[in-house]
Amino acid sequence: MPEQKANCSPNGNITVDSMIMSLGSS
């Protein structure tokens, strides 16, 4: 689950992950 890793990383990767998640959900 790399999504959780990005969420834990305060590198602003949350936004990118959110976009990827949204695209994958589409």
UniProtKB/Swiss-Prot annotation:
It comes from the Eukaryota. Disruption phenotype: Confers sensitivity to osmotic stress. Residues 1-16 have a biased composition (Polar residues). Residues 1-26 are annotated as: Disordered. This is Uncharacterized protein YNL040C-A. It comes from Saccharomyces cerevisiae (strain ATCC 204508 / S288c). The lineage of its organism: Eukaryota, Fungi, Dikarya, Ascomycota, Saccharomycotina.
